UniProtKB/Swiss-Prot annotation:
GO molecular function: anthranilate phosphoribosyltransferase activity; anthranilate synthase activity
Enzyme class per UniProt: lyase
The protein's name in its UniProt record: Anthranilate synthase component 2
This protein's UniProt keywords: Amino-acid biosynthesis, Aromatic amino acid biosynthesis, Glutamine amidotransferase, Lyase, Tryptophan biosynthesis
Oligomer and partners: Heterotetramer consisting of two non-identical subunits: a beta subunit (TrpG) and a large alpha subunit (TrpE).
Pathway note: Amino-acid biosynthesis; L-tryptophan biosynthesis; L-tryptophan from chorismate: step 1/5
Organism encoding this protein: Buchnera aphidicola subsp. Baizongia pistaciae (strain Bp)
SUPFAM superfamilies referenced in this protein's UniProt entry, alphabetically: Class I glutamine amidotransferase-like
Keyword GTP-binding recorded: no
UniProt xrefs under NCBIfam families: trpG_papA
Positions annotated to bind L-glutamine: G57, P58, G59, Q88, S134, L135
Listed InterPro entries: Anth_synth/Amidotransfase, Class_I_gatase-like, GATASE, TrpG/PapA_dom
Matches recorded under Pfam families: GATase
Amino acid sequence: MGNILLLDNIDSFTYNLVDQLRSNFHQVFVYRNTVRKNIILKKLSKMINPILILSPGPGNPDNAGCMPQLLMELKGKLPIIGICLGHQAIVKMYGGHVGYSGEILHGQASLINHDNKAMFLGMSNPLPVARYHSLICSNIPNMLVVNAHFNNMVMAVRNDYEKICGFQFHPESILTTRGTEFLQRVIQWTKI
C-alpha cells in the first residue's frame, strides 16, 4: 500500500486514476494545482513515505499552477510519478524540450516499445497504451533514461537514483489494457 498525494492538473481523468489507485488499497489524497505549494508541502510532511503523482491535464506544464514549483522543491526528496502533463513537466524540469507533436491525439491506442527494465520488466512488448496528447518531449537530458517510445517519440522516462518517472500515456485509461498492473509496478519501483 502506498501513501499517495495526487496533484490534480484539472483533468477529466484524475478520478479514474484515483479509483484505480484506491481499488489497489492505496491511500490517496487529491489536491488541485491551484492550491498554494506550501499547503501541499505541509500535507506531504505529515505523510509516511509519500509518493507524489502528477496527473494529466490540459495545456503546457509551465501553466499548470503550482506543479513546476513543487517539482523543483521535491526533486530527489521523494518518489514522483508524472502522467502525460506530469511527464512533460518532469522532462522540462530536467532541461528537456516540450513541443507540438505534429498530431492531436484523443483516445488513440498505440503499441509502445520499452526496455523491459524497472517498471516495464515482464510487461508485454510492445505494450498497448492509451495516448491523449498534442505535446511531446524531446532533447531528453542524460539524467533521464528513455525507457519507452513509439515511432521515435518518447513515451516514458525514469531517473532511478531520484526515483522520478514519467509516462506520456495514460495507465488509467481502458485502452491501456494492463494499466492497473503497470501502475502497481511503478509504485513498487518507487520503493526499491
